Amino acid sequence: MSDKDTGMAQELKIPPSALMLGLAGLIPFYGLAIWQGITPDELLSERLITAFVLYAACILSFLGGVGWGLAMSETDQLQRGLTFGISTAPSLVGWAAAFINVQNLPFSLSILAMAFLLQGLWDWRLAASGRAPHWFGTLRIGLTIAVISALALAWMMRPELAGTSGSL
């Protein structure tokens, strides 16, 4: 196998540390989604769903930071500015979803699901274009599906939302 082939194989394989940390990052999503739905304590349930939304907002902000880091190495000024701009959106959307959570949980969860979907697609595009390692796109698509599933689970486990599409 040539050095070029070895390098390509390395770029396709998700580094074990990235995979393990990505999967570990799902624990709060699923733990809070389930716990908030099964606790009989209404006050605790409200605090847990708030923690869930805040965690989602933090993760969105983290993902935006990845884009910011990639933008710093861009040589094309237009591309750099576009990537900087797009990378700020996740933290703003996460903040808005956290703020809205108090007033309208279905809308907040919907915003978060859409934000994670769009961020996952953006990250996949970064990898497909060669601006990020190929493995990053693969990892992000898998984690995006898992996070959106956790958002759906949190929705379904809310007693007041179970079996409804919610009201936006």
Ranges and model annotations:
Residues L44-I59:
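Loop-to-helix transition at the N-terminal end of transmembrane alpha-helices
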Residues L126-I148:
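Interfacial loop-to-transmembrane junctions
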Residues G69-I100:
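Helix-adjacent hinge/juxtasegments
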Residues L19-G22, L78-T88, W135-G142:
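Cytoplasmic-side transmembrane-helix entry/capping segments in multi-pass membrane proteins
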Residues L153-L168:
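Juxtamembrane boundary at the C-terminal end of a transmembrane helix
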Residues D5-Q10, G64-D76, G120-A132:
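C-terminal ends of transmembrane helices
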Residues P15-G37, T144-L151:
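The first (N-terminal) embedded transmembrane alpha-helix
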Residues A98-L118:
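Transmembrane helix-loop-helix
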